Structures are given as C-alpha cells and as structure tokens.
Amino acid sequence: MEAAVGDGEGGGGGGGRGKRGRGGGGGEMVEAVWGQTGSTASRIYRVRATGGKDRHSKVYTAKGIRDRRVRLSVATAIQFYDLQDRLGFDQPSKAIEWLINAASPAIDTLPSLDPAAFAAIPHAAADAAPTRRRSQQQQQQLSNKSGCSSTSETSKGSDKEVTVASAPAQAASFTELLIAGVAASSAGGGAIGNGADCVGIAHPGKGGAEGASTYGFSAASSFGDAPPIGMVPAPPFNFSAPGADMAAHYSLAQDQLAAPPPPAGGDYNLNFSMSSGFLGANRGTLQSNSPSNMSGHHHHHHQQQLQRLDGSTISFLLGHAAAAAHPAASEGQITSTAALQLWDGFRHSGMKEKSKN
C-alpha cells in the first residue's frame, strides 16, 4: 500500500517543528527545513521538465531525493486506514499530519539533523530551475526539428511522387516527338520519290486522263511492319496512254503485304510475295530511275531477275495489257506492246544463256 505525504494543509503543533505551508513563487509547495521555521527554500524536485502535477514530483531530503509516495506493509496499511476512518479524514495526508503532531513529544527526543545537509538544497533548487528551462528549450527544439524533418520528408516524398508521375508523361511526349519526326521525314521522302515508286497502268482503249486507273498504297502507313527487304520500292516502269498528262500510279510496295509464314519442317514453301522484283528492276538512287540513265549493267541485272520468272507468271501479270494494247504510240513513249516485247526478249535471252551454260 502507498500513502502520499505532504498533500494537505499545514497542521501545526510540535513547537513549530514540522511546520508546513504555502510559499515561494508559482504556487509551489514550500516545506520548512526541520528545525528552521519560516524557511522559504523549496524542497520539491520536479521529475518532469514541464512541471506536471505534485504527485509526479519528488522531495529533497538529508539523504538525497526521495519519492513522495511511501509503500506500507499490509498490517501497517490496515492500521493506517482504520485510523484515517476513525479520524474522519478523506485524505491519507491529513491522517499522516495528525500522527506527526500527536507524536511531537517523542520526536523532540530524537537527535536533530545536520543543517549542513540542507545547506546545498536552495542552491541545488536554484540550479535546477535553469537546468529545467534549458531542458525544456532543448526538448522544444527537438520537437520542432522532428516536426520540420517529418514535414520535409513528407514534402520530399511528395516531390518524388510528382516526379515519378510526370516521368511517363515526359516519356510519352518524347515518343510522340520521335514519331512526329519520323512521319514528317517519311512524308517528305514519299513526296520526292512518288513518281519513281509507282507504276502507271494505262488503258489503251481510252484516251487522256480517263485511260488511267488510280491505285495507290502509302508506304508510310505500315512503317516498321515490313521486313528489311521490303523497303526496296517499285522500279520505274511507266506505261501511259497517248496524250495523257499524268499516269495513275499503282504501288506494289512490299511493306503493305504481309510476309508468308515459315514452312513446316521438311515442307516446301510455294508461296511468294509481290515485290519490286517481279518488275525486273531494283532501284538505286533517285537519279538512276530515269530511263536515260539505264546502263548495260542495269539491263544485265534485269535479265538475272527475269530468269527467276516463268512464262505463266509473266502472262498472268501482263496478259490483259498485251491483249488490249493500243497499236498507236506517241513519239518518245514506250507503249504496252513494246514493253511486252522487250520483256519477252529479256526472258528468251535469259533462257538461251541458261541452256548454253
């Protein structure tokens, strides 16, 4: 059991010894040193730096700082509470004061305490006050720093989240810029080589712009889908009707055609994809596409490519044009009949060379 000491008002008695009262600044309890009546030295030692309640404090004694709460044995606690009930006090401290006043004659016979033991108490209490203030200030500074650090850490975390969240947007915008640049360059290149990348097919039975059929495919629309070999554009074979100002274009670019799947193990792949090779020309630079720059080496290259084609494939591609070929041709232009004859001559010459070899 525990009994609190020094919670009540002063009881007096005992020739002024043990006299207690209120004094000092701030309403703190001041207890006179035993045998020194009216001393204002505070013997209360605050445990908490912020003060707190009186029951959380300790007191200065001749043997050092001690707790204000006293632990009693079971028998002593029973006797004490019985005495408190008989006295009619509602607080244990009042019963303790009554006992001290009643035992004052016996207390006078006891040896007095050494006054030198209490000489350092006022100085210790005075020194403890600045120490408490400094400790309070330090704790406040630490709490402020911890709050600022937590706030700064929170702000740092929020900055990181904003950066991470904005990173995909930046990456997306950069990708869009790249795509826009590629599209612009592809559009510019397509505009330059438009006439060279297309094959014009004319209807001999019609004249003017009506005899031209318009078939076009955009090579930039499927950029990246075609294999590397598909980047080779169509050769510059243009067949136009007489008097036509512009021939319609029919592009056979391989990037618009899907590559055939690979054959199974042990099987032969009989499929083929349409490319510029069927027309017997592989374009180099833009300047080499004009008919005036066709060299002998270019013709030899045509013959090698024509050897890979059989008669059925050629008749399939150009049979309709040969049947409906217009007999009249303007000067300086190659008609469809002349083109077929030239093509057939290339094929026969290639077959003869192959038979000789």
Curated annotation (Swiss-Prot):
Residues of the TCP domain: 52-110
Positions with biased composition (Polar residues): 142-155, 284-295
GO MF term (any one): DNA-binding transcription factor activity
Region Disordered, annotated ranges: 1-29, 125-162, 281-307
Top-level division of the source organism's lineage: Eukaryota
Example of a GO cellular component annotation carried by this entry: nucleus
One Pfam family hit: TCP
First-listed, main subcellular location of the protein, grouped into a coarse class: nucleus
Protein name stated in the entry: Transcription factor PCF6
Originating species: Oryza sativa subsp. japonica (Rice)
